[in-house]
Design a protein with these regions (language model features):
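Short, extreme N-terminal segment that most often corresponds to the first beta-strand
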Residues: 1-14
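Preference for short coil/turn "hinge" residues that link or interrupt alpha-helices
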Residues: 4-6, 45, 75
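Generic hydrophobic, helix-prone segments enriched in Leu/Val/Ile
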Residues: 6, 60, 82-83
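Short, structured protein-protein interaction patches enriched in aromatics and acidic/basic residues
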Residues: 12, 29-64
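Charged, amphipathic alpha-helical segments
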Residues: 16-27
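Signal for well-folded cores of large energy- and translation-related assemblies
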Residues: 26-29, 87
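Mixed-charge, glycine-accented linear interaction segment located at domain edges/termini
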Residues: 67-98
Length: 98
């Protein structure tokens, strides 16, 4: 699991979701309006649905944790959506990290 630091809060999410979110933020153009994305996460050990608003200038940090990566309901779908969004805005030449 990775810790997502956003707007003063820490959320735990799967490694794949965290990586896909960072990949998406990385390719966002500066002139694109804010976009809300939904990801599965853990907060205080309980599953939650997190909604974050992203722009190219959004300060987002991701750190590794000692918590074993586990399945969260909707994590595969969230990764697919984030990857599609990244491909859409990045255009030709986008290669997601795997």
């Amino acid at each position: 699991m990775k810790a997502l630091l956003y707007a003063g809060h820490e959320l735990l999410t799967t490694d794949d979701v965290a990586d896909a979110l960072l990949d998406y933020v990385e390719v966002l153009p500066l002139n694109q309006p804010p976009e809300r994305v939904v990801i599965p996460a853990l907060r205080d050990g309980l599953p939650v649905t997190a909604e974050v608003v992203l722009t190219a200038a959004t300060p987002v940090a991701v750190t590794t944790t000692s918590i074993r990566d586990t399945h969260l309901e909707g994590d595969i779908y969230a990764v697919e959506v984030l990857r599609r969004k990244a491909e859409r805005v990045a255009g030709i030449g986008y290669e997601p990290r795997m």
